[in-house]
Amino acid sequence: MLVKNWMSKPAITVNADAKLADAISLLEKHEIHMLPAMEGTRLVGIVTDQDLKRGGAPDYSSSTSPNGPDNRLQMAIREIMTMNPVTIYDNQTIEDTAQLLLVHKILGLPVINLFGEVIGMITKSDIFRFIVTAIGMSKDGIQFAMELVDRSGCIKEVTDMMRDYGARIGTIFATHERAKRGYRQAYIRIYDIDQPSLARLVEVLSEKVNMLYVINCQEGMSEIF
């Protein structure tokens, strides 16, 4: 999945010479937490709600008005912004984004095109939205979690068995992280299976693989192994 498919666009930006009051107004109006700071079309920094608090701006979630007399609100954004912010290209992947957010311990990134123009923003919220969609959490279904011997065809054997019981495969996620050596963990979401068939499937799978849990989102039931 590419950044351009999940980023928020267009980017809400602010001039680096604008006042803190202007930044506060934009953050509140658009319900966002960060703004790319610009000099014309050139990205020169980024300012976040945390930067504003560290810079001494009043708590703008309170009744303080951005247009009030507080002199701190008249400071230029460039005085508190983070210069040379980390960016990401629109044709990079969501995985690249998540890695940068973790490494730099930041909430989001300006998205640029090949010409260096800011065309959007991607934040942790966008990453969460991607995860919810990718693993099928936005829809009902039944999630199986299991640990499999890490060999060719191990996941196909399980999904073939699920189909034999009438299930439709929704999403599959597999990882070696936190699995025992020589194993992998698989998370498979299925749909369109009746309760008797589901019960038999769980019983058969439990005899063949190391089941971790089954969560039936349709019935609000879970079984931990």
Report residues per predicted region.
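Tandem CBS (Bateman) regulatory domains
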Residues: 1-10, 49-86, 93-102, 123-164, ...
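Short acidic-hydrophobic, aromatic-tinged amphipathic segments that line or gate anion-handling sites
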Residues: 14-15, 88-89
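Short, basic/aromatic recognition patches
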Residues: 18-25, 96-98
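Short acidic/polar active-site loop segments enriched in Thr and Asp
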Residues: 33, 107, 168
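Conserved short beta-strand edge segments in small beta-sheet-based binding/regulatory domains
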Residues: 170-172, 202-222
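Short basic, glycine-rich beta-strand/loop surfaces that mediate nucleic-acid
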Residues: 183-192
